A protein has these predicted regions:
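Short, solvent-exposed turn/loop segments enriched in Gly/Ser/Thr/Pro and often Arg
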Residues: 1
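Active-site-adjacent betaalpha module
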Residues: 4-122
């Protein structure tokens, strides 16, 4: 996520009043272990909400798409279903070992929901 200083005034902030991923903070920064991959990335998409509406356009030329991240039960599922809705015939995969949910139960529920929507979960 990328949120502004006004996060708590947003709809998300009112329903999830936990300031996180505020632009310019340590919690917003890319983890050091992932920084080399960002430098090689063709695109880095910032998203102010659960789903990245720019993601389908950025992924247009790919036949297979793998998603990982936090939180499985919020952002990962939102983006997996968003991309699957745009590209129902593309192979969309989520690597469960590279994801984590708010709770183990909500993580498992999100993975099950994605499987039901024809997102491959490994």
């Amino acid at each position: 996520d990328t949120h502004g200083a006004d996060y708590l005034a947003t709809q998300e902030g009112k329903k999830l009043p936990v300031p996180h991923c505020i632009r310019g903070t340590v919690g917003w920064a890319i983890a050091d272990a992932l920084a080399p991959f960002v430098k090689e990335a063709e695109a880095v998409i910032e998203k102010p909400t659960f789903g990245a509406t720019a993601l389908p356009t950025a992924l247009r030329d790919y036949d297979a798409i793998e998603l990982v991240g936090l939180c499985t039960d919020i952002c990962v599922i939102s983006n997996a279903l968003l991309v699957k809705a745009f590209y129902p015939e593309k192979r969309i995969c989520v690597d469960a070992a590279c994801c984590a949910g708010v709770t183990p139960e909500s993580h498992a529920n999100a993975l099950a929901a994605m499987r039901m929507c024809q997102v491959e979960v490994r």
